[in-house]
Each structure stands twice: as structure tokens, then as C-alpha cells.
């Protein structure tokens, strides 16, 4: 079968032929329809320090997809041939304390699809049936293919009660924009997103977010005053991993504010901890998606009218995968979809 693989320990990604993966007793064989390029895939393409430490070569990459069930392991129940599915990209062990305690997303033995085991940038994918999620008929293939990053956004945004709150989102990448859209959809009062990338801030404006602020040109305190915010933000969603953005968030949070952190900052990031302590801030780290409550919420949000379509900006045939990666690496894109049909 055709597959996009990391074949060499250098920049790039290559189309190759690999065997169709074998179906285990508890697995599904999925024929891939559409895949989306994640920031992780760009890191792997660029062969940065993280990738060099993490990715075995060769490796079929990719973990954002939608497809059709074409094979079912003999122990599997609840699925049938022809079911349209996406799937959780974190394969968990099932026997650690967190798995057994219902906190599966915190499994200390997690294996990543397209990172530690073959991924979805291929004609076929095998995953444990436990990880598959059936896609409702009224959700398109395009939207289903981005459920993995949408899940990061939903998990982050819904970490706290947002109704009537003022929310600051730092980082207008696709996940940050989707998180801001979720916050607005579920009843936040003001949702402000910050970045320095004007292309992506314009995408955020198309999603109906209260204010998209280019912090290289505007002062966040002026925006807060314009919105009538006298006391600061109630909720912070840190999606950028940029130390200056996080420091600004700490400066502008209200006392007792709550922050969910998905962005990965440098390991040596320094902050003024007195602001955390004297403001009584609560900071929660976010990893992946809650299995599978986040997935049900994703489907329900779309079915209740949340429109994510503006975040998908580019669509290519898999034969034009290089154009897709070029678009993602340029910073002038939202989500990029690759079609395998």
C-alpha cells in the first residue's frame, strides 16, 4: 500500500510502499479516506531535536484521519464493516493506575499513532477497536479528519466553566482558534485571542471570536478597556508555548483566575511566580483528549451548530502531499487536508 513515511534521518517525508498492517484479534482495519497534517507531523518533517529523539526511522507518520472499517478482529464487538470512524491517537496500556481508574488519557505507558507505531498517512491503518470512534452521519469527512486536534481544543476549553466568563486564548494556531470558538459557542462573554501571525488572526475573526489581537501592533490592556473589562480575564487558555504570551496571560488574569496549558514552552521558561501565588491562580496542564468524553463532546458541539469549516483552508490529493506540507510550514494556513480517495 502507499504510505507517507519518514525514511531518512533528515528533513523531508517520502511516499513509499509498505505492507498492509496485520489485523489483531482486538483491532480494526481502517481504509483511510482523508488525513490532516498536524504540527507534530511538521516537526517530524523538519527533523527537529524532539523528532530526532522520538521517531524511529523508517516510520509511517500521521494521526489525524477519517476512514471506513474494512476489517474486524475476532474479539471486537460494537463495530461493523462500513462504519465511518476516526480514532484516538494515544494507545494506552489498560493496566496502570490511571487506566484502571478511568483517567485513561493520563496513561504513563501511552504509545502515539504515527509517532511510536505506524500512523494513518497510508491507505490502511490498524488500531485497537477501543480507540476507534464512530462518526455521526451528519458530520463531514473533512471535519471528522480533524477530530484529533479539535479534541485538544475541546479538552482545553472545557476544563473550566466558561459561561459568562472572559476568556484569553494565547496562540492562534488551528487548535487555539478552535478552542476560542468552543469557548464562545458554549457561552463565554468575551473571548480574546492573541498572536503575531496576521493570517491566522484573520481566520480567528472568521470564527466569530470577540477580538483577535495582534500583540505586535495592539496593547492587550487597551483591548480589555475597550471591552469594559475592569478586573482581568477569568479563564486563560495557553496554546502557544511562547514564554512572552504566558507572562502576559499572568499579568492580565483576574485574581482567582484559572489557566489551562496545552502549549509546550521551553523547559527552562521563567515566570514571576508571585503573580501565581498572590493572585491565587489555578494552572492545569492538558494532555491529549479525555477518553472518550471529549470525543462525544466534539460530535455534540458540531451537531449543535459550532462551525469549524473556516479553519480548513487547504485541500490536496495525497499525490500532492508536498504542497500540503509546504502550506503548513509556511504559517499561512489553517488545517490542511490530504485526500486518499
UniProtKB/Swiss-Prot annotation:
Its EC number is 1.1.1.103. Zn(2+) 2 binds at residues 93, 96, 99, 107. The active site is at 40 (charge relay system), 43 (charge relay system). GO terms for cellular component: cytoplasm. Zn(2+) 1 binds at residues 38, 63-64. Binds 2 Zn(2+) ions per subunit. It comes from the Bacteria. One of its GO terms (molecular function) is L-threonine 3-dehydrogenase activity. Pfam families: ADH_N, ADH_zinc_N. Keywords: Cytoplasm, Metal-binding, NAD, Oxidoreductase, Zinc. Its main location: cytoplasm. Homotetramer. This is L-threonine 3-dehydrogenase.
